[in-house]
């Protein structure tokens, strides 16, 4: 993959583990963004030692703004995200999960909001929940029904709070957001620009583990 030519404004973080089935859709949604040039954003994809055909899928992508890294061993999601953030160039950072995808104006509108609203240190967008076949299920308010992704942060503010906590194997995004909001403001874009895929292998369907980490989160 070629090196990016200019310093991008936005770094998109994708961490993937055995999501070869979904990763192409995710990347194509990000590589076909409107109203923003490719050199104005980068995509950092960290594969957490997948055992499926993820690497084979990625060989089809030669875009100048896509950087791919493979962990030598499985590090887990929080450590992989932190690794990507530390390698990022952009002043804004946003996480997109590898089984999800975004609207074509997602990056443009997120950047525009932060450029115009200096009092906010991040912006969250509403999301549409979709099924395996991308059939619409529901429109969700990201401030009331929070998910870990689709929030664009000013990067220095993420470093200010210490990035993701590796002890949270689930609900890591909610834990980060809780710490972030103690010091910083998150704005709200009432547009379903993020597409959250609800499928049979989705991590958030493991209710037993969710309850464990929710209890841990509530103690903080």
Write out the residue ranges for each language-model feature.
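Catalytic core of nucleotide-sugar-dependent glycosyltransferases
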Residues: 196-199, 205-220
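Glycine-rich, basic loop-to-helix element that forms the pyrophosphate-binding segment
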Residues: 71-88
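Short aromatic/hydrophobic "clamp" motif used to bind/position activated sugar donors
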Residues: 93
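Conserved donor NDP-sugar-binding/catalytic core segment of glycosyltransferases
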Residues: 105-137
């Amino acid at each position: 993959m070629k090196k990016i030519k200019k310093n991008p404004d936005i770094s998109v973080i994708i961490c993937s583990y055995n999501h070869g089935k979904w990763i192409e859709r995710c990347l194509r949604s990000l590589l076909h963004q409107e109203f923003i040039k490719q050199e104005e954003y980068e995509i950092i994809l960290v594969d957490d030692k997948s055992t499926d055909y993820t690497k084979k899928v990625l060989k089809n992508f030669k875009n100048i703004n896509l950087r791919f890294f493979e962990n030598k061993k499985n590090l887990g999601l929080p450590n992989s995200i932190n690794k990507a953030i530390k390698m990022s160039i952009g002043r804004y950072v946003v996480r997109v999960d590898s089984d999800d995808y975004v609207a074509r104006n997602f990056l443009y509108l997120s950047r525009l909001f932060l450029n115009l609203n200096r009092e906010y240190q991040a912006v969250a967008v509403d999301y549409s929940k979709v099924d395996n076949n991308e059939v619409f299920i529901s429109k969700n308010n990201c401030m009331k029904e929070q998910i870990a992704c689709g929030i664009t942060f000013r990067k220095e503010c993420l470093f200010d709070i210490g990035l993701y906590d590796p002890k949270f194997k689930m609900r890591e995004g909610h834990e980060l957001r809780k710490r972030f909001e103690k010091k910083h403001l998150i704005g709200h874009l009432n547009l379903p620009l993020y597409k959250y895929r609800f499928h049979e292998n989705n991590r958030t369907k493991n209710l037993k583990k969710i309850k464990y980490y929710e209890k841990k989160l509530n103690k903080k």
